[in-house]
Design a protein with these regions (language model features):
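Active-site proximal loop and beta-alpha junction motif in alpha/beta enzyme cores
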Residues: 1-83, 90-145
Length: 145
């Protein structure tokens, strides 16, 4: 469940910063996915204690799709993720912001597949969150080096 949720504006684009403790995501709509936008947003994560990773989630509500760009703090690496469970939860938190009580669930299409994120709210607060989806395994392959 989120430690904090707040509206933030970056380069004229309003989005929602969701702190999930250890990882935080800035969920934004109507922005073309780019490393440049991540760099512009990066400073909004600086005041959050104990982050192992942070990301910008480029959300398209109409298509129910998202593209996650995540930075791992320790290695200073920026990665276009194929799928992101915590980013999916952040999107569900954002999309359910106006709910006082009840559940919200959405399957978010991502570059490597779909992840279903669900949140339960009580008194306006998120009291439970979960993710799920189909998992497939490819045939093992052997590589000789």
């Amino acid at each position: 469940c989120p430690r904090s949720v707040k509206r933030v504006t970056v380069n004229g684009h309003e989005g929602t910063l969701v702190d999930l403790t250890g990882i935080a995501h800035f969920v934004v709509e109507g922005v073309e996915p780019s490393e440049g936008f991540f760099r512009a947003a990066e400073s909004i994560f600086s005041g959050i204690a104990g982050l192992d990773a942070c990301g910008v989630i480029f959300l398209d509500v109409e298509k129910r799709s998202m593209i996650p760009l995540v930075k791992v703090i320790e290695t200073d690496s920026l990665v276009w993720e194929g799928s992101c469970g915590s980013g999916s939860v952040a999107c569900a938190v954002v999309q359910s912001e106006r709910m006082e009580n009840g559940g919200f669930s959405c399957e978010y299409r991502q570059p490597a597949g779909a992840v279903r994120a669900s949140v339960e709210r009580q008194g306006g607060n998120v009291i439970a969150a979960s993710i799920g989806g189909e998992v497939t395994l490819d045939e093992p392959m052997r590589i000789t080096l």
